[in-house]
Amino acid sequence: MADMVRAVVQTGPRQMEMREYPRPVLGPTTGAVLRVEACGICGSDVEQYKGAMGARGLPMIPGHEPLGIIEEITDETAARWGVQAGDRVAVEILIPCRSCNRCLAGNYMNCRNRIGSHGGGNPPERQDRLTGGYAEYMDLHPNSIVHPIRNDIPAEIAVMYNPLGAGVRWALEYGGVHLGSTVLVMGAGQRGLAAILASRYVGAGTIIATGLARDAKKLALAKEFGADYTINVDEEDTVARVRELTDGGVDVSLDLTPMAQQPILDAIEATRWGGTIVLAGLKGHKEIAGLKTDMLINKALTVKGAFSVDASGYENAIKLIESGQFALEKMQTHKYGLDDVEHAIKLLAGELPGEEGIHVAVMPGM
């Protein structure tokens, strides 16, 4: 067993380097040692890589969608998590205190005394720990939250638990999509596709997906996953087309686009009176030019911000993965080892001409 393990560290915008760390050892703040099988890459990883999310917490080991095998675990942590050495688990992003009023009320995603995170910014005392998924091993705090997932599912499929959890939660829990709903999904990335899949699963009436001209393959997959119509926003007027297809507007609009502002304005126009808008695409803390809040009032719209995924979203996603009902392998387009992490991120960002990725995974064992 190696004494040193490798991890990819981000030191600044578009700056990554390989470093070696001591293999984690069980202790008061290390409840388990995880051998990382795979870690998904999403749009926020891209923005973090570019520097759009600021320098807070750097240097850090990115990777907030890790999946792996527990190699060592303390008795106390095993009892808390309900798992044992040899189990495969999906790891949640945040490490809550588990004792503040918010945690005790079930709102641990908004913990007042957060210990840190997996793959995001951490306090100084945790910055030298193997906390992110772009590593061969991870140091899991006893307060981390994990979800068991079957070992016989290919790792590159099982690791989709995060985007699938987001799609399920944002469409069904926040959006309230149900039998007969008309739904607009703006953004045909992995979370958009997951939202389409979830909406179709519960019997949505009409599902419309939007994307850019370069998203042709994603939009084709959106139709395979259940979208009735797709809109190329580079060539068509989203609002006009939605109104044409729905006789006035959709019940639910989901904006899952990173940084783009126009989808928010389109959602307000394209959603029917009394409908719901779910905003999940981060915009880099920028103001939205042209936003008219009177329209929200006059149309009696409900607007919800969708922050990450919670335990129910993860558990529903894992049930979906384990069911084998869906051709999830069609979403999984690329997998790379640690030496090629930057290439993987640039691919997902659309920065590599001729290459298009949907779900891209880092596989430290490759």
PLM-predicted stretches and their roles:
Residues 2-5, 179, 232, 243-251, ...:
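C-terminal capping/lid region of NAD(P)-dependent oxidoreductase domains
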Residues 11, 23-24, 57-63, 125-131, ...:
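Short Gly/Pro-enriched turn/cap motifs at secondary-structure boundaries
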Residues 22-39, 53-104, 150-152:
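Glycine-rich beta-strand-centered segment in the early N-terminal region that forms part
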Residues 81-83, 177, 271:
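Short, well-ordered loop/turn sites that connect or cap secondary structure elements
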Residues 86, 136, 150-236, 240:
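Mid-domain Rossmann-like dinucleotide-binding core that forms the NAD(H)/NADP(H) cofactor-binding site
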Residues 97-186:
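NAD(P)H dinucleotide-binding glycine-rich loop of Rossmann-like/cofactor-binding domains
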Residues 204, 217-223, 228, 260-323, ...:
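Glycine-rich phosphate-binding loop and adjacent beta-alpha segment
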Residues 254:
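N-terminal Rossmann-like NAD(P) cofactor-binding module of classical short-chain dehydrogenase/reductase
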